[in-house]
Amino acid sequence: MASRSLGGLGGSRGGGGGVKKSLSARNAAVERRNLITVCRFSVKTLIDRSCFETIDDSSPEFNNFAAILEQILSHRLKESSQSCRWLSHLQIPLQGQVTWFGYGSPRSFWDYIRVACRKVSQNCICSIENMEHVSSSRAKGRAWIRVALMEKHLSEYISTALRDFKTTRRFYEDGAIVLGEEANMLAGMLLGLNAIDFSFCLKGERLDGNLPAVIDYIPYLRFTQSSDSISSDEEELRTLGSSDSESSTPEKAGPPVIMDENSWFNKCKRVKQKYQLTLEQKGYLEELLQLRENQLSESVAQNKILLQRIEDSDLAHKLEKEQLEYIIVELQDQLKSYQSLDQLSAEVSLSQTSLDPGQSQEGDGKQDTLNLISEGKEDTPSLLGLCGSLTSVASYKSLTSLKSNDYLASPTTEMTSPGLTPS
């Protein structure tokens, strides 16, 4: 009997250990899921708030996000002396005081970040380590969160630290968020914060490492009443109303909506900010439209002026072309007249040499007639400047003498022939 009772006691102890282990696993899963979900909501509220105002230390959305991220990075962080030996093996100075029994001051996620993020190019680890007014490890971790957000490299830091799985295993226990599947979701969530311009002051009480970070869950809680609960509330309202008058029954009376005054004030403030932003955008667009209309009118006026100049230049070119064509025709006519006069003068000179003096007088008469004709022909005023070389006396004499020499060759032979000898 005693052995049986002892065996039953041992079995109950074994069953209790299994229940405790399953309960611990369930609690760890709930913690991870809660922190990741709240972190996602916090990032969304930060992005929404950044559309209306600058995010700084006074923003409640940022303070809540910083507390959530600190809780995530501190989830199941080891406190054993093995991590201390690992840090001393890497020749990394320990944060806080080290006693004969191990690590003195409480650990924080900064001890993990400064080891796992050493491979990030142009990291801020050394600058944060050298801060004079930031002494504790937790305060340096909070300063690192702010600097990484201002540098828009927080997602890069977290991704680099999570890829160093060996270092992560050294610092965190099983069931930690950074060791689970939620770690990849965390890096993706933080990537959206690169679009926000943060402005922080690293000298203040907000970096005090003595006070732990507390998450405010109220902004992310929303109660949705089920349909069964709504119907039961309606029945209860009907029952309460029937005490006054059994005939009066409310028609589908819904549950009363109770809104907090602060939530209404915040919504009104957001709507007002959106309205002001819309008005500013409208004014900017109206000014831009007016500027573009002025530029368009100026361009149209310049286009008209250029078209008028093109038409004037085309007309001037046409007139000049017609004038040049007329001058060419006049030059051709004068050239033909000069050629006919040269031919007549050559014939007259030939006839003078071949005929007797009486006939030469007739030739002189013909020459006088030709001279009178040439004198009677008036020069065109438009050709005086262009034909100066043709109207000069020297050129005219040289031209006539040249042509007369050409024509004198054949008549001399005719004069020596017997048929042309004078009787």
Curated annotation (Swiss-Prot):
Protein's UniProt keywords contain Coiled coil: yes
Ranges for domain RUN: 56-205
Gene3D superfamilies named in the record: 1.20.58.900
Annotated region described as Disordered, given as residue ranges: 1-20, 232-258
Keywords attached to this entry: Coiled coil, Methylation, Phosphoprotein
Bias type Polar residues, positions: 240-250
Alphabetical list of CDD domains matching this protein: RUN_RUNDC3B
Modified residues (Phosphoserine): S231, S232
Omega-N-methylarginine found at: R13
InterPro entries referenced in this protein's UniProt entry, alphabetically: Run_dom (IPR004012), Run_dom_sf (IPR037213), RUN_RUNDC3B (IPR047339), RUNDC3A_B (IPR047340)
Keyword Nucleus: no
Coiled coil region boundaries: 293-341
Segments of skewed composition (Gly residues): 7-19
Assembly with partners or alone: Interacts with RAP2A.
Assigned protein family: Belongs to the RUNDC3 family.
Protein name (database record): RUN domain-containing protein 3B
Organism, scientific name: Bos taurus (Bovine)
